[in-house]
């Protein structure tokens, strides 16, 4: 059974960092706490599994080209018998029990994934700052301006910071690229790992509207 919970965010002015207004969003959450953990675990495994890619791939004796002819006759040469020069015992032969390419696919329902994201949005509520327009002063790629903007909200780049905007701009991407603890995401591309990892979240007001529409179906 799902319950509805109201989250009231204070909209902080980008000029003087004072509260300008407030905005309310309603998130649907699971009533059972053990179900929340289960859903989060499923969503996390889904994302991590689908990012795995085992490329190492060795060939068995049946896959190595050549070796169709018997190297020498079975008897009379004094040598050990051999049926193919692509045997794993031979140089250039196949590999026994070597690594094989494998796809790690873990499926999850859309509603389960959305519920997991809503649970995390609720859990990170106290560590979330909503700004009127965070990127107003960044018209060219400039990491220093970005760091100074974060400091205005008492955010330290030594902590993991997630910036959520309504639309990713190239200037903002280039400004955050050099900061290892700062991640930039568009509101329509939220993911479990980024939300779990973030110590602080800063959201554009327009991005909050997108989150409210997208993840509450």
Curated annotation (Swiss-Prot):
InterPro entries for this protein: Ribosomal_uL4, Ribosomal_uL4-like, Ribosomal_uL4_dom_sf
GO biological process, one term: translation
Gene Ontology terms, MF aspect: rRNA binding; structural constituent of ribosome
Start and end residues of each stretch annotated as Disordered: 51-85
One Pfam family linked to the record: Ribosomal_L4
Subcellular location: Plastid, Chloroplast
Main location: plastid
Keywords noted in UniProt: Chloroplast, Plastid, Ribonucleoprotein, Ribosomal protein, RNA-binding, rRNA-binding
Assigned GO CC terms: chloroplast; ribonucleoprotein complex; ribosome
The protein's role, per its UniProt record: Probably binds the 23S rRNA.
Family note: Belongs to the universal ribosomal protein uL4 family.
NCBIfam families: rplD_bact (TIGR03953)
Description of how the protein assembles with itself and partners: Part of the 50S ribosomal subunit.
PANTHER family, per database record: 50S RIBOSOMAL PROTEIN L4, LARGE RIBOSOMAL SUBUNIT PROTEIN UL4C
Protein name: Large ribosomal subunit protein uL4c
Species, as recorded: Gracilaria tenuistipitata var. liui (Red alga)
């Amino acid at each position: 059974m799902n319950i509805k919970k109201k989250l009231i965010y204070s909209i902080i002015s980008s000029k003087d960092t004072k509260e300008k207004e407030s905005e309310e969003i309603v998130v649907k959450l699971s009533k059972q706490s053990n179900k929340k953990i289960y859903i989060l675990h499923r969503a996390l495994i889904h994302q991590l599994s689908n990012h795995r890619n085992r490329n190492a791939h060795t060939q068995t004796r049946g896959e190595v080209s050549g070796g169709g002819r018997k190297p020498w006759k079975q008897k009379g040469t004094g040598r050990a018998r051999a049926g193919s020069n692509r045997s794993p015992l031979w140089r250039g032969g196949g590999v026994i029990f070597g690594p094989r390419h494998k796809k790690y696919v873990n499926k999850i329902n859309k509603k389960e994934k959305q519920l997991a994201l809503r649970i995390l949005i609720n859990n990170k509520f106290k560590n979330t700052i909503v700004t009127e327009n965070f990127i107003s002063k960044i018209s060219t790629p400039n990491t220093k301006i970005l760091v100074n903007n974060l400091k205005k909200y008492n955010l330290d780049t030594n902590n993991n910071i997630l910036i959520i905007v309504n639309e990713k701009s190239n200037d903002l991407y280039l400004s955050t690229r050099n900061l290892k603890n700062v991640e930039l995401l568009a509101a329509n591309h939220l993911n479990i790992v980024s939300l779990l990892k973030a110590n602080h979240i800063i959201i554009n007001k327009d991005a909050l509207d997108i989150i409210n529409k997208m993840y509450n179906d």
